[in-house]
């Protein structure tokens, strides 16, 4: 059964993932990535422009589909070897502000989960946000 997920990641890190065709969540932990399966969908929510910045964004910034079931490590620095998964991202999307998500009836359930960094959402919520992100 296909599942739908949200990952909470700063926009600059989302862009790296989209450009490289991969995802990372929860500061590179493998457990959350293993919960997703081939064919599952991921929305990225970016609270900020960059991890080390105070500049807020508060928007959904990318959407993609898990390509396979492989979770692997990748050395980004000698002391940072995070886990990743390969993702096929949708390229014809634009950021969707959090105000749009607040209009969905499930938002109150999901708003409190943003602090966890990765969580499952309903198909209906995913499609609501994804449709708002799609470029005409």
Curated annotation (Swiss-Prot):
SUPFAM superfamilies: PUA domain-like. Pfam families: EVE (PF01878). This is UPF0310 protein SMU_442. Signal peptide: none annotated. Belongs to the UPF0310 family.
């Amino acid at each position: 059964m296909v599942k739908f997920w949200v990952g909470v990641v700063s926009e600059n890190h989302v862009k790296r993932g989209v450009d490289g065709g991969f995802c990372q969540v929860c500061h590179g932990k493998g457990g959350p990535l293993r919960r997703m399966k081939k064919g599952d969908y991921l929305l990225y929510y970016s609270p900020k422009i960059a991890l080390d910045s105070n500049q807020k964004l508060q928007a959904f910034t990318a959407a993609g589909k898990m390509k396979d079931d492989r979770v692997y490590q990748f050395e980004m620095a000698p002391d940072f070897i995070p886990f990743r998964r390969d993702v096929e991202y949708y390229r014809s999307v634009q950021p969707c502000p959090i105000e749009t998500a607040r209009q969905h009836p499930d938002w109150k359930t999901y708003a409190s989960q943003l602090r966890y960094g990765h969580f499952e959402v309903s198909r209906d919520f995913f499609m609501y946000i994804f449709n708002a992100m799609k470029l005409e």
